[in-house]
Amino acid sequence: KKVTAITAQAGYAVDSSSKKVLFSRNPKMKFYPASTVKLLTALVVLDNMKLKDTIRVSRRASSVAPTKAGLTRGASYSVSDLLKVLLATSANDAGVALAEAASGSQERFALLMNKKARSLGCRNSNFTNPTGLPDKRQLTTAYDLYLITRAAFNNSFIASVMRQKNVTIAGSDAKPITLRNHNKLLWRMPEPCVLGKTGYTRSAGHCYAGLAIYDDGRVIVVILKSRNPYSDIRKILSKR
């Protein structure tokens, strides 16, 4: 089926069972990933830390640019809770706190991100921070992001977090933080169920890296530099 008017400048979608490529546009062209990099951040954290480990939030982490969860500076949170707000609600403060705890600094963490990406088969990407905040050197391709997304959704913890419409966490200060999942498809599309990481900056446009779950299979779908991401995802999935 020919799909018209997909606004994304790049994308890649694969049916996991048949391995059929449902959509491919500029799969090796480099784009800014925005917050879709948080899937890679989560994979690196899970390789290096335990979910029950606790992390004290630094001044640097608490004062990072939005989007953020509003973590309390000096309070401690579990890795599990920080990953929940990182993945479901795109919290940059959680991303910085996790990166600092896993490796000492965002710069050192970026080295781990690149190493992990290479191990997954990514050949045309460069990662410089755990949040996806704008950096001209942080680039990926739709195909590389597909490899990262596939690995992320194979992780049962990441997949379970992405299903949650709302997440609530509390740190050592006992102040609960409740936030909505940024992925509007959890509300808009009952079938298939589409779990996904959103991303947006002015330079990156709208990005999305997700998993569509059908009764009889799964599709990994990635788009970069879109003007209308949810419509694009719907149109790509209609090709199945």
Predicted regions and their residues:
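Active-site-adjacent loops and short helices of periplasmic peptidoglycan-processing enzymes
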Residues: K1-Y143, L147-S156, Y214-D215
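Domain-terminus/edge residues, biased toward the C-terminal soluble/receptor-binding domains
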Residues: C122-R123, P134-R240
